[in-house]
Amino acid sequence: DLNFKLFGDTLSLTANGFFHRLNPTFYYRHYHSRHAWWDNNSMSKMLHTRLQGILHYQKTRTTLRIGIDEINNYAYFASSYTVNNGNRVNHAITVNQYGGAINLITVALSQDFTLGPLNWESVITYQKSNNKTVLPVPDFNIYSNLYIKFKIARVLSCDFGADVRYFTKYFAPDYNPGLGQYTVQTNTATDGTDS
């Protein structure tokens, strides 16, 4: 951590990172059910490296985070299906492991405002994956949360508000209830809001 004086307050710069060498989790290696069955004992260990820097200015409650990830031997679930008259048919789930390196760049800008009981928190994130078929992410993601914070009878804290999310078009992962996991898919691209 480094701290700098700026306009009567402190600007802090933090750098961190990690290196993980992990076996793919149990369900990537073994799964037995009525509709899917696999035993993958020969999967390679995943290597995940992250370097990130965080610049934070307390006076304006502004944070800038820049991160770079590299993932080797990335394991993931993939689903495929055919849409026939609005129904999904020929649904198949596979476990895949990408043998190359996947690079992910993330730049996130956070800004928080408070005016009496009114609070507004916003985050704008830019992400770029060099392999969107294996690790799909939206290019831009915006999150905003507007709420009022107050106390009832000076003891009960209350937060009342709403949040909104927007992201650019991408192939969002599908949820598979049989596995209880998200799977990569290339059938339906999604974008827009979720509030």
Regions inferred by a protein language model and the residue ranges of each:
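Exposed, low-structure sequence patches enriched in small/polar residues
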Residues: 1-195
